[in-house]
């Protein structure tokens, strides 16, 4: 049989061969395209926040039957805030793991105005990096080796909340996507005893997200350093009452009130109290308000701290690993009626220089000139 068309006469045998050839090659092309699609990507996108682009680390979704991280958004113009983390959770699809507004709303709020004094909007969303101290610090009674760090009367969560990174670079391969930033912080506008260089890395890999912060004393005087992270983790089901938190902590730091949340200098055991976060089943959040520092932490043989957030209603679990031996406290913040909990592993207790501590070690690391210290946390997903 012959077919006649615009290209002339074609034999049935030739036509069959052409069709067979097309059929055999097409799957190869599709397979090749699939192989060429990168497992991890990095992009720098708008809007500009803090005059720098947003960095987005992304991972290709591989197995929808398992929980896995999908993307991370970072704000190098605002102290390398880990603004959003997304993950695929079976039954829920891709969800936000951090309590954050849209990037456009964040840009409007992070404007240096009255509500953003000292970068305060940065610790209201996402996950702010806290340096050179975590938690709260009074200005007046602050005393370190007879010196007065020149903070405000009441400073929150360090001095880099509104800082733009001095330099940023990114990298990707088949196993991870990462961003690296450096901040030449100096003496924080004459508010700290010596000069500091900060190196911050954020890495999205096959099974985890990791954050590392290294502080180096590049000045001529010894200085104290406290580092922390302030992520607002969502409760995906929205049912806060049944969600549970497990922290291997034996103690709770008492505060004078929940307005200023300054410590009294007293520490009490959590066993048998409404604040026992150490029980194996976890503390059920219920209707309880939390804004408390937990101490007396138990760690594994490698000095790692493991915290668990469990939302059984969503079949969602999150391991929050503190991988720095200098992490001495965990701040938990979860207002009653809100479907999130801030879980903040940190070096130091609140108001670490206060006289209420009466000489107690409050977790600040002392760095001599040229010395450095590294803070690290790692997130892993699991099905409870």
Regions found by a protein language model. Give the residues of each.
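Beta-strand-rich N-terminal accessory domains
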Residues: 27-145, 301-327, 371-382
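Active-site/ligand-binding surface loops and adjacent short beta/alpha elements
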Residues: 124, 232-324
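Acidic, contiguous internal or C-terminal segments within carbohydrate-active enzymes
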Residues: 57-81, 85, 89-91, 183-236
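C-terminal motif of bacterial Sec signal peptides marking the signal peptidase cleavage site
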Residues: 20-21
